[in-house]
Amino acid sequence: MDKSLFEQARPILEQIQDNGFEAYYVGGSVRDYVMGRNIHDIDITTSATPDEIESIFSHTIPVGKEHGTINVVFNDENYEVTTFRAEEDYVDHRRPSGVTFVRDLYEDLQRRDFTMNAIAMDTAYKLYDYFDGQQDINNRIIRTVGIAEERFQEDALRMIRCLRFQSQLSFDIATETFEAMRIQMADIKFLSIERIVIELTKLMRGINVEKSFNHLKSLKAFNYMPYFEHLDMNQINVTEAIDLELLIAIVSVKFDINYSLKPLKLSNRQVKDINQYIQIMNALPSIITKEQLKMFVYDYDTHLIKNVMVAADVLKANDIQGHEPLIVNLQTIDETLHRLPMHNRKDMMVNGGVLMAHLNAKSGPWLKDVLRQIEIAIVTGKVSNEETEILKWVDNHVKI
């Protein structure tokens, strides 16, 4: 089992210990280590206060000092070091009203969300598991630390995280944990949509997404999320992992809607991808010739095209017509892309200025139309991408 990331962080823990404080690895990295999975981010918990951590290390960043977290920069890597803490009453089902620093590891671990995430480990790889997290991992069970209702009242996002972990790890959810989610799911309406979107993005890429997505529906989670709250999500089926952006596009096509995406507070890139996914799904069924395929591959991001094609079963499960496999398949997409004479309008050997000078015409709506006609002619092989040939083609085929 690869311990290299733990070993890279070991000097940080040892330096904290050399100064008279406790320090442990904690959270997802320990969970994944116990499961035999690849380790990613290393989180460290300690009895030292943020001020004490800053005094121990020469290069620190106070990213969340008021909450007990200091970034320690070591060998050009950032490590989150968080003081043992007990959280006070939560407000709005999403954040504690205050944080109290403590010196006891048990007190710190008991505030965490799930037993599998509440295991600490020292530099000798000894585990500190006060809540039977290893047993739950071995039994493939997601269970809250302590009383489920209390954990979800503290932070309603934990319910969505629970389903995300189920999707990623293919674990079952403990009965009492699931029942608490059923009772308290409405509390997610107090959360920021940004936090929900982060969890949904990970959930949709999980190996067991079908089960978790069905739980989202049965628990009526979508009823309390902006954008989705106006839709009958029970009609949407997800049978395999897809991007969240593709899910939103499928919803738009399935219900033939054009709702604003602003309530989801997505990035410009995400909105652009969703709109392309919608256009791709609408265009796919009509592609029956090689010329149409060339323009399709030219007009759209081939990565997104392939995502839609790979998700053919999801489209079918939502009664969305897919592609004609003899014309459009992964091989023909790659071959067509490789053979395109150009890949965007910037590659074209004429521009608007050249056209206006050649035709002795002022700019106007005609220009955009003619440039598109030239694009199509070049991509479909009707004219070569050379200025003299293009202008000759314009003289013979274009009227303004």
Swiss-Prot record:
SUPFAM superfamilies: Nucleotidyltransferase, Poly A polymerase C-terminal region-like. Mg(2+) binds at residues 41, 43. The lineage of its organism: Bacteria, Bacillati, Bacillota, Bacilli, Bacillales. ATP binds at residues 28, 31, 112, 155, 158, 161, 164. It comes from the Bacteria. Its EC number is 2.7.7.72. InterPro entries: Bact_CCA-adding_enz_type3_sf, CCA-adding_enz_C, CCA-adding_enz_firmicutes, NT_sf, PolA_pol_head_dom, PolyA_RNA-bd. Its cofactor is Mg(2+). It holds the Pfam family PolyA_pol. GO terms for molecular function: ATP binding; CCA tRNA nucleotidyltransferase activity; magnesium ion binding; tRNA binding. A single active site specifically recognizes both ATP and CTP and is responsible for their addition. Catalyzes the addition and repair of the essential 3'-terminal CCA sequence in tRNAs without using a nucleic acid template. Adds these three nucleotides in the order of C, C, and A to the tRNA nucleotide-73, using CTP and ATP as substrates and producing inorganic pyrophosphate. tRNA 3'-terminal CCA addition is required both for tRNA processing and repair. Also involved in tRNA surveillance by mediating tandem CCA addition to generate a CCACCA at the 3' terminus of unstable tRNAs. While stable tRNAs receive only 3'-terminal CCA, unstable tRNAs are marked with CCACCA and rapidly degraded. NCBIfam families: PRK13299.1. It catalyses: a tRNA precursor + 2 CTP + ATP = a tRNA with a 3' CCA end + 3 diphosphate; a tRNA with a 3' CCA end + 2 CTP + ATP = a tRNA with a 3' CCACCA end + 3 diphosphate. One of its GO terms (biological process) is tRNA 3'-terminal CCA addition. Homodimer. It comes from Staphylococcus aureus (strain Newman). It is an enzyme of class 2 (transferase). Keywords: ATP-binding, Magnesium, Metal-binding, Nucleotide-binding, Nucleotidyltransferase, RNA repair, RNA-binding, Transferase, tRNA processing. Belongs to the tRNA nucleotidyltransferase/poly(A) polymerase family. Bacterial CCA-adding enzyme type 3 subfamily. CTP binds at residues 28, 31, 112, 155, 158, 161, 164. This is CCA-adding enzyme.
